[in-house]
Protein backbone atom coordinates (compact mmCIF):
# COMPACT_ATOMS: atom_id res chain seq x y z
CA UNK A 1 0.00 0.00 0.00
CA UNK A 2 2.80 2.37 0.95
CA UNK A 3 4.63 1.49 -2.26
CA UNK A 4 1.58 2.33 -4.37
CA UNK A 5 1.31 5.72 -2.73
CA UNK A 6 5.03 6.47 -2.88
CA UNK A 7 5.59 5.50 -6.53
CA UNK A 8 3.52 8.34 -8.10
CA UNK A 9 5.02 10.81 -5.64
CA UNK A 10 8.59 9.79 -6.54
CA UNK A 11 7.78 9.98 -10.25
CA UNK A 12 6.32 13.45 -9.81
CA UNK A 13 9.33 14.67 -7.83
CA UNK A 14 11.72 13.22 -10.42
CA UNK A 15 9.74 14.81 -13.27
CA UNK A 16 9.89 18.21 -11.53
CA UNK A 17 13.66 17.87 -11.06
CA UNK A 18 14.11 17.03 -14.76
CA UNK A 19 12.00 20.02 -15.85
CA UNK A 20 13.96 22.29 -13.49
CA UNK A 21 17.26 20.95 -14.88
CA UNK A 22 16.07 21.57 -18.45
CA UNK A 23 15.24 25.19 -17.62
CA UNK A 24 18.58 25.75 -15.89
CA UNK A 25 20.51 24.17 -18.75
CA UNK A 26 18.53 26.17 -21.31
CA UNK A 27 19.39 29.41 -19.47
CA UNK A 28 23.05 28.48 -18.96
CA UNK A 29 23.85 27.61 -22.59
CA UNK A 30 24.60 30.52 -24.93
CA UNK A 31 22.44 28.98 -27.66
CA UNK A 32 19.98 27.34 -25.28
CA UNK A 33 18.43 23.95 -25.90
CA UNK A 34 16.71 23.15 -29.18
CA UNK A 35 12.93 22.98 -28.74
CA UNK A 36 12.97 19.37 -29.93
CA UNK A 37 15.16 18.50 -26.94
CA UNK A 38 12.03 18.74 -24.81
CA UNK A 39 10.22 16.13 -26.91
CA UNK A 40 9.74 12.74 -25.34
CA UNK A 41 11.80 9.93 -26.85
CA UNK A 42 8.63 8.10 -27.87
CA UNK A 43 7.62 11.18 -29.88
CA UNK A 44 10.88 11.03 -31.83
CA UNK A 45 10.44 7.31 -32.46
CA UNK A 46 6.83 7.67 -33.61
CA UNK A 47 7.69 10.57 -35.91
CA UNK A 48 10.56 8.62 -37.40
CA UNK A 49 8.52 5.46 -37.99
CA UNK A 50 5.69 7.52 -39.55
CA UNK A 51 8.11 9.12 -42.00
CA UNK A 52 7.18 8.43 -45.65
CA UNK A 53 10.66 7.18 -46.61
CA UNK A 54 10.83 4.88 -43.59
CA UNK A 55 7.39 3.46 -44.38
CA UNK A 56 8.52 2.77 -47.95
CA UNK A 57 11.69 1.10 -46.64
CA UNK A 58 9.60 -1.13 -44.35
CA UNK A 59 7.44 -2.19 -47.32
CA UNK A 60 10.52 -2.88 -49.44
CA UNK A 61 12.12 -4.89 -46.63
CA UNK A 62 8.92 -6.91 -46.33
CA UNK A 63 8.86 -7.63 -50.09
CA UNK A 64 12.54 -8.64 -50.18
CA UNK A 65 12.16 -11.07 -47.28
CA UNK A 66 9.21 -13.41 -47.77
CA UNK A 67 9.70 -14.84 -44.28
CA UNK A 68 8.90 -11.49 -42.64
CA UNK A 69 5.33 -10.21 -42.35
CA UNK A 70 4.62 -6.47 -42.52
CA UNK A 71 4.04 -6.47 -38.75
CA UNK A 72 7.42 -8.13 -38.13
CA UNK A 73 9.15 -5.64 -40.44
CA UNK A 74 7.51 -2.84 -38.44
CA UNK A 75 8.77 -4.35 -35.18
CA UNK A 76 12.26 -4.62 -36.67
CA UNK A 77 12.13 -0.95 -37.64
CA UNK A 78 11.06 0.03 -34.10
CA UNK A 79 13.95 -1.97 -32.59
CA UNK A 80 16.38 -0.16 -34.91
CA UNK A 81 14.87 3.24 -34.03
CA UNK A 82 15.07 2.52 -30.29
CA UNK A 83 18.73 1.53 -30.67
CA UNK A 84 19.60 4.74 -32.53
CA UNK A 85 17.50 7.48 -30.94
CA UNK A 86 18.82 9.02 -27.70
CA UNK A 87 16.76 9.82 -24.63
CA UNK A 88 18.32 13.13 -23.57
CA UNK A 89 18.02 13.64 -19.82
CA UNK A 90 18.91 17.18 -18.78
CA UNK A 91 19.19 16.21 -15.10
CA UNK A 92 21.66 13.42 -15.88
CA UNK A 93 23.55 15.59 -18.38
CA UNK A 94 23.87 18.52 -15.97
CA UNK A 95 24.36 16.74 -12.64
CA UNK A 96 26.18 13.54 -13.62
CA UNK A 97 27.43 13.54 -17.22
CA UNK A 98 29.19 16.90 -17.24
CA UNK A 99 30.52 16.55 -13.69
CA UNK A 100 31.93 13.07 -14.38
CA UNK A 101 33.45 14.09 -17.73
CA UNK A 102 35.05 17.24 -16.35
CA UNK A 103 36.63 15.50 -13.37
CA UNK A 104 37.87 12.46 -15.30
CA UNK A 105 39.45 14.64 -17.99
CA UNK A 106 41.09 16.91 -15.41
CA UNK A 107 42.34 13.87 -13.54
CA UNK A 108 44.03 12.45 -16.63
CA UNK A 109 45.05 15.56 -18.58
CA UNK A 110 46.06 19.15 -18.66
CA UNK A 111 43.09 20.16 -20.83
CA UNK A 112 43.85 22.94 -23.31
CA UNK A 113 41.66 24.78 -25.84
CA UNK A 114 42.66 27.17 -28.60
CA UNK A 115 41.27 29.31 -31.43
CA UNK A 116 44.23 29.56 -33.86
CA UNK A 117 42.54 31.63 -36.58
CA UNK A 118 40.67 34.00 -34.32
CA UNK A 119 42.36 36.72 -32.29
CA UNK A 120 39.11 37.46 -30.48
CA UNK A 121 39.01 33.96 -28.99
CA UNK A 122 35.61 32.38 -29.59
CA UNK A 123 33.68 35.59 -30.38
CA UNK A 124 33.27 34.70 -34.07
CA UNK A 125 30.75 32.06 -32.97
CA UNK A 126 28.48 34.81 -31.64
CA UNK A 127 27.48 35.48 -35.25
CA UNK A 128 25.82 32.08 -35.61
CA UNK A 129 22.06 32.49 -35.93
CA UNK A 130 19.64 30.44 -33.87
CA UNK A 131 17.85 29.07 -36.93
CA UNK A 132 21.10 27.48 -38.08
CA UNK A 133 22.08 23.91 -37.34
CA UNK A 134 25.57 23.79 -35.81
CA UNK A 135 27.77 20.79 -36.62
CA UNK A 136 31.19 20.32 -35.00
CA UNK A 137 33.41 18.45 -37.47
CA UNK A 138 36.43 16.76 -35.90
CA UNK A 139 39.19 14.25 -36.44
CA UNK A 140 38.95 10.98 -34.48
CA UNK A 141 41.80 9.76 -32.27
CA UNK A 142 40.11 8.15 -29.28
CA UNK A 143 36.73 7.00 -27.98
CA UNK A 144 36.93 9.82 -25.42
CA UNK A 145 36.90 12.45 -28.21
CA UNK A 146 33.15 13.20 -27.98
CA UNK A 147 33.35 13.65 -24.21
CA UNK A 148 36.27 16.06 -24.58
CA UNK A 149 34.35 18.09 -27.17
CA UNK A 150 31.17 18.09 -25.07
CA UNK A 151 33.21 19.35 -22.11
CA UNK A 152 34.79 22.11 -24.22
CA UNK A 153 31.47 23.19 -25.77
CA UNK A 154 29.44 22.96 -22.54
CA UNK A 155 29.08 26.73 -22.15
CA UNK A 156 27.78 27.05 -25.70
CA UNK A 157 25.47 24.14 -26.45
CA UNK A 158 24.59 20.50 -25.77
CA UNK A 159 26.15 18.52 -28.65
CA UNK A 160 24.73 15.24 -29.96
CA UNK A 161 27.44 12.89 -31.24
CA UNK A 162 27.22 9.47 -32.82
CA UNK A 163 28.72 6.57 -30.86
CA UNK A 164 29.80 3.33 -32.48
CA UNK A 165 29.25 -0.30 -31.61
CA UNK A 166 31.42 0.02 -28.49
CA UNK A 167 28.50 1.84 -26.81
CA UNK A 168 26.00 -0.97 -27.35
CA UNK A 169 24.81 -3.09 -24.46
CA UNK A 170 23.94 -2.40 -20.84
CA UNK A 171 24.79 -0.04 -19.17
CA UNK A 172 26.73 1.96 -21.78
CA UNK A 173 23.80 2.29 -24.18
CA UNK A 174 21.54 3.79 -21.51
CA UNK A 175 24.24 6.20 -20.32
CA UNK A 176 25.22 7.28 -23.83
CA UNK A 177 21.57 7.86 -24.78
CA UNK A 178 20.97 9.88 -21.60
CA UNK A 179 23.61 12.48 -22.53
CA UNK A 180 22.08 12.87 -26.00
CA UNK A 181 24.34 10.65 -28.12
CA UNK A 182 22.84 8.39 -30.77
CA UNK A 183 24.30 4.95 -31.48
CA UNK A 184 25.08 3.73 -34.98
CA UNK A 185 26.48 0.61 -36.61
CA UNK A 186 28.92 2.05 -39.13
CA UNK A 187 29.24 -1.06 -41.30
CA UNK A 188 25.58 -2.07 -41.28
CA UNK A 189 24.44 -2.46 -44.90
CA UNK A 190 20.78 -3.36 -44.30
CA UNK A 191 18.76 -0.85 -46.45
CA UNK A 192 16.10 -0.52 -43.73
CA UNK A 193 18.74 0.35 -41.13
CA UNK A 194 20.44 2.88 -43.43
CA UNK A 195 17.10 4.53 -44.23
CA UNK A 196 16.12 4.88 -40.56
CA UNK A 197 19.55 6.30 -39.67
CA UNK A 198 19.41 8.74 -42.60
CA UNK A 199 15.95 9.98 -41.68
CA UNK A 200 16.81 10.35 -37.98
CA UNK A 201 19.89 12.45 -38.79
CA UNK A 202 17.78 14.50 -41.21
CA UNK A 203 15.11 15.05 -38.53
CA UNK A 204 17.66 16.08 -35.89
CA UNK A 205 19.44 18.58 -38.17
CA UNK A 206 16.16 20.03 -39.48
CA UNK A 207 15.16 20.63 -35.82
CA UNK A 208 18.49 22.48 -35.29
CA UNK A 209 19.77 19.96 -32.73
CA UNK A 210 23.54 20.69 -32.49
CA UNK A 211 25.49 17.78 -33.96
CA UNK A 212 29.03 16.48 -33.89
CA UNK A 213 30.65 14.16 -36.44
CA UNK A 214 34.05 12.56 -36.87
CA UNK A 215 34.87 13.19 -40.50
CA UNK A 216 37.24 10.18 -40.68
CA UNK A 217 34.46 7.77 -39.72
CA UNK A 218 36.81 5.67 -37.56
CA UNK A 219 39.86 5.95 -35.31
CA UNK A 220 43.11 6.98 -36.99
CA UNK A 221 45.32 3.95 -37.57
CA UNK A 222 48.66 5.73 -37.93
CA UNK A 223 48.18 9.08 -36.19
CA UNK A 224 47.54 11.01 -39.41
CA UNK A 225 44.04 11.91 -40.56
CA UNK A 226 42.17 9.46 -42.74
CA UNK A 227 40.35 10.60 -45.91
CA UNK A 228 36.89 12.02 -45.24
CA UNK A 229 34.09 9.52 -44.68
CA UNK A 230 31.04 11.19 -46.20
CA UNK A 231 28.05 9.11 -45.03
CA UNK A 232 26.77 11.17 -42.08
CA UNK A 233 27.90 14.43 -43.68
CA UNK A 234 25.77 13.65 -46.72
CA UNK A 235 22.75 12.87 -44.52
CA UNK A 236 23.17 16.12 -42.60
CA UNK A 237 23.44 18.53 -45.51
CA UNK A 238 20.24 17.11 -47.03
CA UNK A 239 18.38 18.84 -44.17
CA UNK A 240 19.35 22.31 -45.42
CA UNK A 241 16.24 24.55 -45.62
CA UNK A 242 14.01 21.82 -44.17
CA UNK A 243 12.01 22.43 -41.01
CA UNK A 244 13.62 25.05 -38.76
CA UNK A 245 17.06 24.70 -40.37
CA UNK A 246 17.77 27.73 -42.59
CA UNK A 247 21.51 27.13 -42.78
CA UNK A 248 24.15 24.65 -41.62
CA UNK A 249 27.28 25.89 -39.84
CA UNK A 250 30.32 23.60 -39.74
CA UNK A 251 32.85 24.28 -36.97
CA UNK A 252 36.19 22.49 -37.54
CA UNK A 253 37.73 21.02 -34.39
CA UNK A 254 41.16 19.39 -34.24
CA UNK A 255 41.97 17.04 -31.34
CA UNK A 256 45.36 15.79 -30.22
CA UNK A 257 46.66 14.04 -27.11
CA UNK A 258 49.99 13.32 -25.49
CA UNK A 259 48.51 9.90 -24.78
CA UNK A 260 45.02 8.41 -24.93
CA UNK A 261 43.62 5.39 -23.06
CA UNK A 262 43.40 2.86 -25.90
CA UNK A 263 46.60 3.73 -27.80
CA UNK A 264 48.48 0.53 -26.91
CA UNK A 265 45.55 -1.80 -27.65
CA UNK A 266 44.87 0.03 -30.93
CA UNK A 267 48.53 -0.31 -31.89
CA UNK A 268 48.56 -4.03 -31.04
CA UNK A 269 45.44 -4.67 -33.13
CA UNK A 270 46.93 -2.86 -36.12
CA UNK A 271 50.30 -4.61 -35.72
CA UNK A 272 48.62 -8.02 -35.56
CA UNK A 273 46.22 -7.16 -38.42
CA UNK A 274 43.22 -7.73 -36.18
CA UNK A 275 39.75 -6.32 -36.76
CA UNK A 276 38.74 -3.06 -35.14
CA UNK A 277 37.24 -2.48 -31.69
CA UNK A 278 33.69 -3.02 -32.80
CA UNK A 279 34.35 -6.70 -33.47
CA UNK A 280 35.77 -7.44 -30.05
CA UNK A 281 33.77 -9.65 -27.71
CA UNK A 282 31.50 -7.42 -25.61
CA UNK A 283 32.50 -9.17 -22.41
CA UNK A 284 36.17 -8.30 -22.92
CA UNK A 285 35.29 -4.74 -23.97
CA UNK A 286 33.41 -4.26 -20.70
CA UNK A 287 36.23 -5.94 -18.80
CA UNK A 288 38.72 -3.49 -20.32
CA UNK A 289 36.46 -0.58 -19.34
CA UNK A 290 36.17 -1.84 -15.76
CA UNK A 291 39.96 -2.28 -15.62
CA UNK A 292 40.46 1.29 -16.82
CA UNK A 293 38.04 2.64 -14.21
CA UNK A 294 39.92 0.79 -11.49
CA UNK A 295 43.21 2.26 -12.73
CA UNK A 296 41.69 5.72 -12.34
CA UNK A 297 41.80 5.19 -8.58
CA UNK A 298 45.61 5.16 -8.70
CA UNK A 299 45.58 8.54 -10.46
CA UNK A 300 43.66 10.29 -7.67
CA UNK A 301 46.74 10.86 -5.54
CA UNK A 302 48.65 14.12 -6.19
CA UNK A 303 51.60 13.86 -8.56
CA UNK A 304 53.90 16.14 -10.53
CA UNK A 305 52.77 14.99 -13.96
CA UNK A 306 49.35 14.17 -15.31
CA UNK A 307 49.23 10.45 -16.22
CA UNK A 308 48.23 11.13 -19.84
CA UNK A 309 49.82 14.56 -20.33
CA UNK A 310 48.00 17.16 -22.45
CA UNK A 311 44.66 16.91 -24.23
CA UNK A 312 44.20 19.72 -26.71
CA UNK A 313 41.36 20.99 -28.91
CA UNK A 314 41.64 23.78 -31.46
CA UNK A 315 38.45 25.26 -32.90
CA UNK A 316 38.57 26.81 -36.37
CA UNK A 317 36.58 29.40 -38.28
CA UNK A 318 32.92 28.47 -38.91
CA UNK A 319 32.04 27.43 -42.47
CA UNK A 320 28.48 28.23 -43.55
CA UNK A 321 27.04 25.79 -46.06
CA UNK A 322 25.15 28.63 -47.78
CA UNK A 323 28.39 30.59 -48.29
CA UNK A 324 30.22 27.48 -49.51
CA UNK A 325 27.47 26.84 -52.07
CA UNK A 326 27.75 30.45 -53.27
CA UNK A 327 31.51 30.06 -53.69
CA UNK A 328 30.96 26.88 -55.69
CA UNK A 329 28.06 28.49 -57.62
CA UNK A 330 25.89 25.47 -56.92
CA UNK A 331 22.87 24.34 -54.93
CA UNK A 332 23.27 20.78 -53.67
CA UNK A 333 19.52 20.18 -53.90
CA UNK A 334 19.46 20.98 -57.62
CA UNK A 335 22.21 18.63 -58.84
CA UNK A 336 22.12 14.96 -59.81
CA UNK A 337 23.34 12.18 -57.53
CA UNK A 338 26.73 11.72 -59.26
CA UNK A 339 27.49 15.44 -59.24
CA UNK A 340 26.26 15.66 -55.65
CA UNK A 341 28.73 12.99 -54.51
CA UNK A 342 31.60 14.92 -56.08
CA UNK A 343 30.51 18.14 -54.38
CA UNK A 344 30.05 16.45 -50.98
CA UNK A 345 33.53 14.96 -51.43
CA UNK A 346 34.87 18.46 -52.15
CA UNK A 347 33.16 19.78 -49.00
CA UNK A 348 34.61 16.90 -46.98
CA UNK A 349 38.10 17.68 -48.32
CA UNK A 350 37.69 21.35 -47.40
CA UNK A 351 36.71 20.46 -43.83
CA UNK A 352 39.55 17.91 -43.53
CA UNK A 353 42.09 20.49 -44.70
CA UNK A 354 40.78 23.02 -42.19
CA UNK A 355 41.10 20.48 -39.37
CA UNK A 356 44.65 19.58 -40.42
CA UNK A 357 45.64 23.26 -40.54
CA UNK A 358 44.68 23.79 -36.87
CA UNK A 359 45.98 20.47 -35.51
CA UNK A 360 47.27 21.04 -31.94
CA UNK A 361 51.04 20.74 -31.63
CA UNK A 362 51.42 18.78 -28.40
CA UNK A 363 54.66 18.20 -26.47
CA UNK A 364 54.44 14.45 -27.15
CA UNK A 365 54.27 15.00 -30.91
CA UNK A 366 57.30 17.32 -30.74
CA UNK A 367 59.38 14.88 -28.66
CA UNK A 368 58.40 11.93 -30.89
CA UNK A 369 59.40 13.87 -34.03
CA UNK A 370 62.75 14.86 -32.53
CA UNK A 371 63.63 11.33 -31.37
CA UNK A 372 62.67 9.74 -34.71
CA UNK A 373 64.82 12.23 -36.62
CA UNK A 374 67.81 11.33 -34.45
CA UNK A 375 67.19 7.64 -33.84
CA UNK A 376 70.62 6.55 -35.12
CA UNK A 377 72.23 7.65 -31.86
CA UNK A 378 71.31 8.03 -28.22
CA UNK A 379 70.15 11.34 -26.84
CA UNK A 380 70.48 12.83 -23.39
CA UNK A 381 67.47 14.53 -21.85
CA UNK A 382 69.06 17.95 -22.35
CA UNK A 383 69.71 17.17 -26.04
CA UNK A 384 66.09 16.11 -26.57
CA UNK A 385 64.85 19.34 -25.00
CA UNK A 386 67.28 21.44 -27.05
CA UNK A 387 66.24 19.79 -30.32
CA UNK A 388 62.58 20.08 -29.32
CA UNK A 389 62.99 23.82 -28.70
CA UNK A 390 64.68 24.17 -32.11
CA UNK A 391 61.74 22.40 -33.75
CA UNK A 392 59.27 24.60 -31.87
CA UNK A 393 61.19 27.65 -33.08
CA UNK A 394 60.96 26.43 -36.68
CA UNK A 395 57.22 26.05 -36.19
CA UNK A 396 56.85 29.57 -34.76
CA UNK A 397 54.53 30.45 -37.67
CA UNK A 398 52.09 28.00 -36.05
CA UNK A 399 52.51 29.35 -32.53
CA UNK A 400 48.74 29.60 -32.13
CA UNK A 401 48.50 25.82 -32.70
CA UNK A 402 50.80 25.10 -29.76
CA UNK A 403 49.00 24.15 -26.56
CA UNK A 404 51.43 23.84 -23.67
CA UNK A 405 50.57 22.62 -20.16
CA UNK A 406 50.78 25.38 -17.54
CA UNK A 407 52.30 27.55 -20.34
CA UNK A 408 55.66 26.05 -19.36
CA UNK A 409 57.48 24.49 -22.34
CA UNK A 410 60.21 22.86 -20.23
CA UNK A 411 57.67 21.22 -17.92
CA UNK A 412 55.56 20.00 -20.85
CA UNK A 413 58.57 18.43 -22.60
CA UNK A 414 59.66 16.71 -19.37
CA UNK A 415 56.15 15.35 -18.97
CA UNK A 416 56.19 13.93 -22.51
CA UNK A 417 59.52 12.19 -21.84
CA UNK A 418 58.10 10.82 -18.58
CA UNK A 419 55.09 9.32 -20.40
CA UNK A 420 57.30 7.77 -23.10
CA UNK A 421 59.46 6.16 -20.43
CA UNK A 422 56.44 4.92 -18.51
CA UNK A 423 55.07 3.32 -21.69
CA UNK A 424 58.50 1.79 -22.34
CA UNK A 425 58.68 3.43 -25.75
CA UNK A 426 62.07 4.86 -24.83
CA UNK A 427 64.51 3.57 -22.23
CA UNK A 428 67.40 5.12 -20.33
CA UNK A 429 70.88 3.73 -20.88
CA UNK A 430 73.83 3.51 -18.52
CA UNK A 431 75.03 6.99 -19.43
CA UNK A 432 71.62 8.55 -18.70
CA UNK A 433 70.86 8.83 -22.41
CA UNK A 434 67.68 7.63 -24.09
CA UNK A 435 67.14 5.19 -26.93
CA UNK A 436 64.04 3.90 -28.73
CA UNK A 437 62.69 0.44 -27.96
CA UNK A 438 62.35 -0.98 -31.48
CA UNK A 439 59.35 -3.11 -30.51
CA UNK A 440 57.46 0.10 -29.72
CA UNK A 441 58.83 2.35 -32.42
CA UNK A 442 55.48 2.30 -34.27
CA UNK A 443 53.80 4.01 -31.30
CA UNK A 444 56.39 6.78 -31.47
CA UNK A 445 55.68 7.16 -35.19
CA UNK A 446 51.95 7.28 -34.41
CA UNK A 447 52.37 10.34 -32.19
CA UNK A 448 54.77 12.05 -34.60
CA UNK A 449 52.41 11.53 -37.56
CA UNK A 450 49.77 13.77 -35.97
CA UNK A 451 51.85 16.88 -36.83
CA UNK A 452 53.95 15.47 -39.67
CA UNK A 453 52.02 17.49 -42.27
CA UNK A 454 52.83 20.70 -40.34
CA UNK A 455 56.53 19.87 -39.90
CA UNK A 456 56.96 19.19 -43.64
CA UNK A 457 55.59 22.60 -44.67
Regions found by a protein language model. Name each.
Residues 1-212, 217-457:
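Membrane-interfacial terminal anchoring regions of lipid-handling membrane enzymes
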Amino acid sequence: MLGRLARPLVRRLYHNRVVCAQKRLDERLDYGLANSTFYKRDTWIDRLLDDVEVQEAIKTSNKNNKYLSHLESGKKARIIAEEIIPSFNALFYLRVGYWFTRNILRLLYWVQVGYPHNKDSDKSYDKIKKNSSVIIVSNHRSNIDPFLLVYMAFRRSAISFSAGEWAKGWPMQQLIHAIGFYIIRRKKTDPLYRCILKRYVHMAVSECVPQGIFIEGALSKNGAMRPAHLGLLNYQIRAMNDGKCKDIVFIPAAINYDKFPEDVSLFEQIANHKKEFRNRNRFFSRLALIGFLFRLITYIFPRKYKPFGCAAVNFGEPLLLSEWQEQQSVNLKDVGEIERRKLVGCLGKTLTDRINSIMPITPMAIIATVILKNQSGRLASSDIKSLANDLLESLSRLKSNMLIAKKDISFSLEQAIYILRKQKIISRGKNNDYYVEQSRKKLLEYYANSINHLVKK
